[in-house]
Amino acid sequence: MSRLDQKTVANRYARAIFELAQEDGQLDQTYQELVSVRQVFLDNPSLAPLLAGVDLGIKEKQALVDQVKEGASKYVANLLQMAFDYRRMSDMVAIVDEFERRYDEKHKRVHAEVVTAVQLDETRRNQLRDNLAARLGAQEIVLNEKVDPTILGGVVVKTANQTLDGSIKTKIEQIRRLIVK
């Protein structure tokens, strides 16, 4: 029996819980819970290997899973238990990432990494959000801001699908290439 790759596993599990939560009107709650579960795994990088490894017995592993499931809705609790039962705990972050991708697509939400030479103030941040939303056809833009003085000015925006480079550094390089020709 071949082991499925992580992307295939994440797609299947995420699609299943997404469809169930959507049918039951629990999509927003399930999303919030899964983001919290993902954070548990990210904050405790040894958790997934511990649950997948041989250092703990099955009862100790189940006790850890039960702690993560504590307070979770039936969908999230069932997902965690199924991932544990089928030895897919190492895929949990990927499963939540895929669920979030589906959630974002449904809500027309785009995550954008924004690089500027200086920190954006609230006015410029809101202008950038509005411009990106219009350009990308999104209802919501989630910005992950980074400051990099080497771009000299302007802004570089990276989304899952594209990169928009309006940095002064790139414009100078383009002019330099034209002059050298």
UniProtKB/Swiss-Prot annotation:
Leader sequence segment: none
Listed Gene3D superfamilies: N-terminal domain of the delta subunit of the F1F0-ATP synthase
Subcellular location: Cell membrane
GO MF term list: proton-transporting ATP synthase activity, rotational mechanism
Keyword annotations of the record: ATP synthesis, Cell membrane, CF(1), Hydrogen ion transport, Ion transport, Membrane, Transport
SUPFAM superfamilies on file: N-terminal domain of the delta subunit of the F1F0-ATP synthase
Any single GO CC term annotated in Swiss-Prot or TrEMBL for this entry: plasma membrane
Pfam families recorded: OSCP
Similarity comment text for this entry: Belongs to the ATPase delta chain family.
Database matches in NCBIfam families: ATP_synt_delta
Listed name of the protein: ATP synthase subunit delta
Lineage: Bacteria, Bacillati, Bacillota, Bacilli, Lactobacillales
